């Protein structure tokens, strides 16, 4: 999932620690609360994307949509029994959502078509639209889709880095979190090196430790800003 998404008039991000959606009107410099789920009527927030002028939110109770100018989330699809949606992403004017075991596609989020339920990737955890491709963070590594999610091809497989549980992209860099640490790629996930200067906050979510946002330690902010 992209940890920060950019809509035409604002940027949005999920705050997993406080179960809320935050908004920025100044190019990710400052953030305020867009939607706070104080009484948990929607459940635990899992994934967020911007699609056809609206926000789409995955929670443990289903998929919701809202206008991007006012937080009015309405249920468009209930959770799947026995195989819950864990993330959502907009790609080539279609919505894609993953359970741990399958990929689904929809135009508006209400009716989902199964696109892939193979075992080659292991469990799916996160989807990301990056540099014109749809990426997935999976139990076995990083995979890239073709033919609208029907096929998934290995981009990076390595047991040494651990299980990939979260992806985010900024500029030409990919950021990832595995169950062994934080990593960054400069060549669209073909090679990874440790990103030791990433710090939290983060929390347990979706089967692994989920990155809240990538940011640098103070001493390195002047040389490279990634927020």
Identify the residue ranges that each predicted region occupies.
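Kelch-like beta-propeller repeat domains
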Residues: 67-74, 107, 173-175, 209-212, ...
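Short coil-to-beta transitions that initiate beta-strands within beta-rich domains
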Residues: 1-8, 33-51, 74-92, 114-131, ...
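Sequence/structural signature of beta-propeller modules
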Residues: 1-22, 212, 216-227
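Loop/turn residues immediately N-terminal
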Residues: 18-22, 60-64, 100-104, 140-143, ...
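Short coil turn/linker residues within repeat-based beta-strand modules
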Residues: 28-29, 70-71, 109-111, 149, ...
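Conserved Ser/Thr-centered positions that define the repeating blades of beta-propeller domains
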Residues: 24-25, 66-67, 105-107, 145-146, ...
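Tandem repeat domain/solenoid detector
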Residues: 75, 92-94, 101, 114, ...
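Entry beta-strands of beta-propeller and related beta-repeat scaffolds
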Residues: 7-13, 54-57, 94-97, 133-136, ...
